[in-house]
UniProtKB/Swiss-Prot annotation:
It is found in: Secreted, Cell wall; Secreted, Extracellular space, Apoplast. One of its GO terms (molecular function) is hydrolase activity, hydrolyzing O-glycosyl compounds. GO terms for cellular component: apoplast. This is Probable xyloglucan endotransglucosylase/hydrolase protein 7. InterPro entries: Beta-glucanase/XTH, ConA-like_dom_sf, GH16, GH16_AS, XET_C, XTH. Glycans are attached at N117, N213. Pfam families: Glyco_hydro_16 (PF00722), XET_C (PF06955). CDD domains: GH16_XET (cd02176). Its main location: secreted. Residues 30-223 form the GH16 domain. Its EC number is 2.4.1.207.
Length: 293
């Protein structure tokens, strides 16, 4: 069944979100050229720099996908990119933007995974949080716009108290520090910033029912406005614990009232999967699921 991206009940609120996103500007924004902070990590023949390195193109074809990574790792801060996703029939493809500690079995990881679709269906973004090697915390949201028509900003804000995933400055997920409930929280290992474009038609679209259509290849995704603000590791030893870092300020301890309303709107109208409510996987909800925002 084709799902409409918009419904009459959502139009007014969608316009309100657009106004909020236009008025809000990230603190100390510093968009950079690709080579300032990143390197090609996988298949350099499939990544092309555009506009003097201010934007890049990722390509997926039957021979290979591709990926890039930050030159440094970071412990706390905010990372963001503007991404224009694959248009049309993108079923079976995954465009990922994530942070990863690169520590194998005890890895920490914060994921945005954009799951390709058949033409006319909404794009789904899956988020996941790995802490001390434990993941299985998937949530899925249908985006309320067509992310292939223009660039949209995707950001991860990470401090000692919480992790927030943003789409155009609208929070779509909050993961709190619940170590008091014996829930692991990523606060010891620095993480690099990564992005990949790859084929995953065994699970990405409708659980693997929709397969990739290679006759439409190559598939392209575009990136620009790369922004990393955080404590580099190696770097000043006192940086990660410095409470004066802007991302540790009181404004970033909890969502603002406007953000909280936007977050609830996303969950009510656009969330299509939440591990917290999946009783087949978790008959007893994990303890972090009752933490609220």
């Amino acid at each position: 069944m084709v799902v409409s991206l918009f419904s009459s009940r959502n139009v007014f609120y969608t316009l309100s979100l657009c106004l909020f996103a236009a008025l809000y500007q990230p603190v100390m924004s510093r968009p950079a050229k690709f080579e300032d902070d990143f390197r090609i990590a996988w298949s350099d023949t499939h990544i092309t720099q555009i506009d003097g390195g201010r934007a890049i193109q990722l390509k997926l074809d039957p021979s290979s996908g591709c990926g890039f990574a930050s030159k440094k790792q970071y412990l706390f801060g905010r990372v963001s990119m503007k991404i224009k996703l694959i248009p049309g029939d993108s079923a079976g493809t995954v465009t990922a933007f994530y942070m990863n500690s690169d520590t194998d079995s005890v890895r920490d990881e914060l994921d945005f995974e954009f799951l390709g679709n058949r033409s006319g269906q909404p794009y789904t973004v899956q988020t996941n949080v790995f802490a001390h090697g434990k993941g299985d915390r998937e949530q899925r949201v249908n985006l309320w716009f067509d992310p292939s028509r223009d660039f949209h900003e995707y950001a991860i804000s990470w401090n000692h108290l919480r992790i927030v995933f943003y789409v155009d400055n609208v929070p779509i997920r909050v993961y709190k520090n619940n170590e008091a409930r014996k829930v692991p929280y990523p606060r010891f290992q620095p993480m690099g910033v990564y992005s990949t474009l790859w084929e995953a038609d065994d699970w990405a679209t409708r659980g693997g029912i929709e397969k990739i259509n290679w006759s439409r290849a190559p598939f392209y995704a575009y990136y620009k406005d790369f922004d990393i603000e955080g404590c580099p590791v190696p770097g000043p030893a006192d940086c990660p614990a410095n409470s004066k870092n802007w991302w540790e300020g009181s404004a970033y301890h909890q969502l603002s009232p406007v953000e909280a309303r936007s977050y609830r709107w996303v969950r009510v109208n656009h969330m299509v999967y939440d591990y917290c409510t999946d009783k087949s996987r978790f008959p007893v909800p994990p303890p972090e699921c009752s933490a609220g925002i």
